[in-house]
């Protein structure tokens, strides 16, 4: 029987789709690096009566009446975010990481200003200046990337480009970079050319909160993040900044980019921040990193090539060219074995972004199920059976491994 009792009565089609999605999440191994499974407490907050409340403005300065209780919720989220990351100011209203990034741009830049960000094709993000994104249309972005041989950011090259282009803002952070980011070096480069520094830590925020990745907060005027991914909160965004930028950042989000905040999601963010301050969260993040290292080793031992040779965080990029597979083909084949990944461009990829030569793999969601290093080696074996062999017998063996792991590590048990 479905848990969506009222929904089944009102809209059985949507309820049925939700039932199928829940079944997929329970019976598949989720390896998309940007996805995770929130706690039931976070889901309760996200599905609460707060979805009914309009609250344009900020706590104590609303354009609607009846905001005394949602003010309490937003203040909790703000104070917890500041405490969790040691920040001077936090804006928890962005609906997404993309909105958080645009909020920073509109707070500190004018249209046409020069910004230095990471090349999307080398692991950056659409909102770091891709020409198809609004960021690339409003501002003059120039790109840095990774070294062709090491797969790592060449900071000397970043400095050279910064000296040549004199950006007003440098953006550090990535959506597909498996190595530690040197925020001190980015700060030094920014200072040398008179630029501000923004760090998009969307992927690594949970690791930063747990002290397992250097924090960008002491180095950057602005830090943006999503609240899902490794942070294991609801889908949403957040901006941390120095106090001197607080008013401009807040004004850029509301009324600049958004109207009413999503108070039910802000409540869920507050819950996630509270969870992230517990000792169990640090242990969880340590397991994410240990699982990523174990999965990287398991794949390497089975003949897979990883961009940069491995990982320092929660994700890895697999270069499939030695397997004579495209990322698109690998994603489809793994999905048939109930392993969920996403096709992803590798640096200097000869394939189009719709095909790609690689896949991106991450461990946050599998770790949320309780999987450990031994389980990651079994996952590596299932991936190997599916992609290196691909015969019907091998695919059946891979599915059997997935079934056993999902039974051993149930979701929302």
Curated annotation (Swiss-Prot):
<comment type="pathway">
    <text>One-carbon metabolism; tetrahydrofolate interconversion.</text>
</comment>
<dbReference type="Pfam" id="PF00464">
    <property type="entry name" value="SHMT"/>
</dbReference>
<feature type="binding site">
    <location>
        <begin position="352"/>
        <end position="354"/>
    </location>
    <ligand>
        <name>(6S)-5,6,7,8-tetrahydrofolate</name>
    </ligand>
</feature>
<dbReference type="GO" id="GO:0030170">
    <property type="term" value="F:pyridoxal phosphate binding"/>
</dbReference>
<dbReference type="GO" id="GO:0019264">
    <property type="term" value="P:glycine biosynthetic process from serine"/>
</dbReference>
<keyword id="KW-0554">One-carbon metabolism</keyword>
<dbReference type="InterPro" id="IPR015421">
    <property type="entry name" value="PyrdxlP-dep_Trfase_major"/>
</dbReference>
<feature type="binding site">
    <location>
        <position position="120"/>
    </location>
    <ligand>
        <name>(6S)-5,6,7,8-tetrahydrofolate</name>
    </ligand>
</feature>
<feature type="binding site">
    <location>
        <begin position="124"/>
        <end position="126"/>
    </location>
    <ligand>
        <name>(6S)-5,6,7,8-tetrahydrofolate</name>
    </ligand>
</feature>
<dbReference type="GO" id="GO:0035999">
    <property type="term" value="P:tetrahydrofolate interconversion"/>
</dbReference>
<feature type="site" description="Plays an important role in substrate specificity">
    <location>
        <position position="228"/>
    </location>
</feature>
<dbReference type="InterPro" id="IPR015422">
    <property type="entry name" value="PyrdxlP-dep_Trfase_small"/>
</dbReference>
<comment type="similarity">
    <text>Belongs to the SHMT family.</text>
</comment>
<comment type="function">
    <text>Catalyzes the reversible interconversion of serine and glycine with tetrahydrofolate (THF) serving as the one-carbon carrier. This reaction serves as the major source of one-carbon groups required for the biosynthesis of purines, thymidylate, methionine, and other important biomolecules. Also exhibits THF-independent aldolase activity toward beta-hydroxyamino acids, producing glycine and aldehydes, via a retro-aldol mechanism.</text>
</comment>
<keyword id="KW-0663">Pyridoxal phosphate</keyword>
<dbReference type="GO" id="GO:0004372">
    <property type="term" value="F:glycine hydroxymethyltransferase activity"/>
</dbReference>
<keyword id="KW-0963">Cytoplasm</keyword>
<dbReference type="InterPro" id="IPR001085">
    <property type="entry name" value="Ser_HO-MeTrfase"/>
</dbReference>
<dbReference type="GO" id="GO:0005829">
    <property type="term" value="C:cytosol"/>
</dbReference>
<dbReference type="InterPro" id="IPR015424">
    <property type="entry name" value="PyrdxlP-dep_Trfase"/>
</dbReference>
<comment type="subunit">
    <text>Homodimer.</text>
</comment>
<comment type="pathway">
    <text>Amino-acid biosynthesis; glycine biosynthesis; glycine from L-serine: step 1/1.</text>
</comment>
<dbReference type="InterPro" id="IPR049943">
    <property type="entry name" value="Ser_HO-MeTrfase-like"/>
</dbReference>
<dbReference type="InterPro" id="IPR039429">
    <property type="entry name" value="SHMT-like_dom"/>
</dbReference>
<feature type="modified residue" description="N6-(pyridoxal phosphate)lysine">
    <location>
        <position position="229"/>
    </location>
</feature>
<keyword id="KW-0808">Transferase</keyword>
<keyword id="KW-0028">Amino-acid biosynthesis</keyword>
<protein>
    <recommendedName>
        <fullName>Serine hydroxymethyltransferase</fullName>
        <ecNumber>2.1.2.1</ecNumber>
    </recommendedName>
</protein>
<dbReference type="InterPro" id="IPR019798">
    <property type="entry name" value="Ser_HO-MeTrfase_PLP_BS"/>
</dbReference>
């Amino acid at each position: 029987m479905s848990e969506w009792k009222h929904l089944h009565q009102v809209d059985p089609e949507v309820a049925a789709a939700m039932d199928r999605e829940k079944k997929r999440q329970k019976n598949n191994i989720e390896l998309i690096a940007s996805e995770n499974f929130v706690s039931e407490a976070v889901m309760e907050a996200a599905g609460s009566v707060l979805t009914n409340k309009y609250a344009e403005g900020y706590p104590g300065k609303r354009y609607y009446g009846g905001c005394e209780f949602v003010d309490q919720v937003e203040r909790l989220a703000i104070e917890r975010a500041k405490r969790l990351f040691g920040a001077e100011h936090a804006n928890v209203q962005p609906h997404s990481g993309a909105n958080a990034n645009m909020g920073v741009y509109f707070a500190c830049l004018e249209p046409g200003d020069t910004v230095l960000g990471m090349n999307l094709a080398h692991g950056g993000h659409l909102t770091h200046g891709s020409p198809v994104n609004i960021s690339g249309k409003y501002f003059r972005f120039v790109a840095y990337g990774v070294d062709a041989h090491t797969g790592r950011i060449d900071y000397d090259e970043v400095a050279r480009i910064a000296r040549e282009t004199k950006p007003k803002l440098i953006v550090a952070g990535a959506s597909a970079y498996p190595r530690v980011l040197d925020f001190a070096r980015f700060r030094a480069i920014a200072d040398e050319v008179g630029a501000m520094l923004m760090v998009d830590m969307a992927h690594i925020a949970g690791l930063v909160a747990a002290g397992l990745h250097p924090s960008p907060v002491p180095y950057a005027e602005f830090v943006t993040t999503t609240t899902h991914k490794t942070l294991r909160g609801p889908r949403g965004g957040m901006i941390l900044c120095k106090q001197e930028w607080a008013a401009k950042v807040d004004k850029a989000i509301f009324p600049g980019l958004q109207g009413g905040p999503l108070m039910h999601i802000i409540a869920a963010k507050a819950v996630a921040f509270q969870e992230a301050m517990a000792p169990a969260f640090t242990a969880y993040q340590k397991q994410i990193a240990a699982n990523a290292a174990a999965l990287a080793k398991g794949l390497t031992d089975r003949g897979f090539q990883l961009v940069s040779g491995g990982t320092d965080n929660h994700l890895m990029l697999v270069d499939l060219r030695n397997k004579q597979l495209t990322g698109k083909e690998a994603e489809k084949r793994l999905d048939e074995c109930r392993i969920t990944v996403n096709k992803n461009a590798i640096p200097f990829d000869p394939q189009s972004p719709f095909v790609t030569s690689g896949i991106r793999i991450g461990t946050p969601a599998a770790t949320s199920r309780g999987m450990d290093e031994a389980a990651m080696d079994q996952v590596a074996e299932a991936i190997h059976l599916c992609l290196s062999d691909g015969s019907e017998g091998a695919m059946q063996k891979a599915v059997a491994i997935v079934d056993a792991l999902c039974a051993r590590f149930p979701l929302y048990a």
